[in-house]
Amino acid sequence: MASNGTSVSPFRSQKNAAMAVNDTPANGHAEPSTITAASKTNTTKITSQNDPQSSFAVKVGLAQMLKGGVIMDVVNAEQARIAEEAGACAVMALERVPADIRKDGGVARMSDPQMIKDIMNAVTIPVMAKSRIGHFVECQILQAIGVDYIDESEVLTPADPVNHIDKSVYNVPFVCGCKNLGEALRRISEGAAMIRTKGEAGTGDVVEAVRHMQTVNAEIAKASSASDADLRMMARELQCDYNLLKQTAQLKRLPVVNFAAGGIATPADAALMMQMGCDGVFVGSGIFKSGDAAKRAKAIVQATTHYNDPKVLAEVSSGLGEAMVGINCDKLPETQKLATRGW
């Protein structure tokens, strides 16, 4: 149970110990075109210091520790404690949930570091924070204050219209969004240790997350049955690394964890994405924009754990109060769709 004082996070202690042994040099460049140990197990053997491949494997292993869990958006320490008590595996610290970012408009930037540190001090579970696409200085700041994961997020206003961040030069594991397999593999090639669907954050409409997961699954299935020549052609079409695509085809899944995000608002939504093959879920506006946040948070955690048990799903879906009103994605103008950001 977290207290009002500074909390000691067992996860953070373990992460810092692992990264201290396997420190990536400030100007080092990992080349994660082939991933081995971390795609098979939650623990990674560290083979040598300053080895980019080994460092990347450690980050992938840290991301795998969240598998099967729910990551919740929180805007203050009180919400973070509610999320932790509900069973969240991590929290995403940000000043405004995506629904408010949509409503308020303007430029959405990295959150105030002090607010993030307050949340880190309030809970013992991992804390994530968002940076703008391409804004490597925001990532330097987030790493400096000790966040556990960084989300290079399309929810914030992109800082670079062309380039994503070279994530390999940071010790902190990165999570990035995707709409399709090409985007996912490009982000992994840049050093992302965790992938999520983009969906349409802040809408409460799960349809885009479903679409993105279906697309990734279909493209992996196509790659898995392709000849070597066809696989090389597919890599060119997807604009991704051939070796990484080949590994994905052999695994019949992404070589890093793949969570669902964007529009998940109910326990049924969470179970739907898990049954489609996701490794866990992000829930943003769906919890703290609902009638009973604490009860809904617990219900979504239970639904994510027991996603194949309709009786449990029926039980945890009952009596939750009003869900967030939401926005129908079909009514969103293209200019308001966050998933189109990035490439």
UniProtKB/Swiss-Prot annotation:
The active site is at K130 (schiff-base intermediate with d-ribose 5-phosphate). Its EC number is 4.3.3.6. Keywords: Lyase, Pyridoxal phosphate, Schiff base. InterPro entries: Aldolase_TIM, PdxS/SNZ, PdxS/SNZ_N, RibuloseP-bd_barrel. It catalyses: aldehydo-D-ribose 5-phosphate + D-glyceraldehyde 3-phosphate + L-glutamine = pyridoxal 5'-phosphate + L-glutamate + phosphate + 3 H2O + H(+). Disruption phenotype: Defects cause some indirect sensitivity to photosensitizers, due to the inability to synthesize pyridoxal 5'-phosphate. Indeed, pyridoxal 5'-phosphate quenches singlet oxygen at a rate comparable to that of vitamins C and E. Induction: Accumulation is enhanced two-fold by light, but is unaffected by the presence of cercosporin, a photosensitizer synthesized by C.nicotianae. Pfam families: SOR_SNZ. It comes from the Eukaryota. One of its GO terms (biological process) is pyridoxal phosphate biosynthetic process. Pathway: Cofactor biosynthesis; pyridoxal 5'-phosphate biosynthesis. D-ribose 5-phosphate binds at D73, G202, G263, G284, S285. D-glyceraldehyde 3-phosphate binds at Q214. GO terms for molecular function: pyridoxal 5'-phosphate synthase (glutamine hydrolysing) activity. PROSITE patterns: PDXS_SNZ_1, PDXS_SNZ_2. The keyword Lyase applies. Catalyzes the formation of pyridoxal 5'-phosphate from ribose 5-phosphate (RBP), glyceraldehyde 3-phosphate (G3P) and ammonia. The ammonia is provided by PDX2. Can also use ribulose 5-phosphate and dihydroxyacetone phosphate as substrates, resulting from enzyme-catalyzed isomerization of RBP and G3P, respectively. Also plays an indirect role in resistance to singlet oxygen-generating photosensitizers. Belongs to the PdxS/SNZ family. This is Pyridoxal 5'-phosphate synthase subunit PDX1.
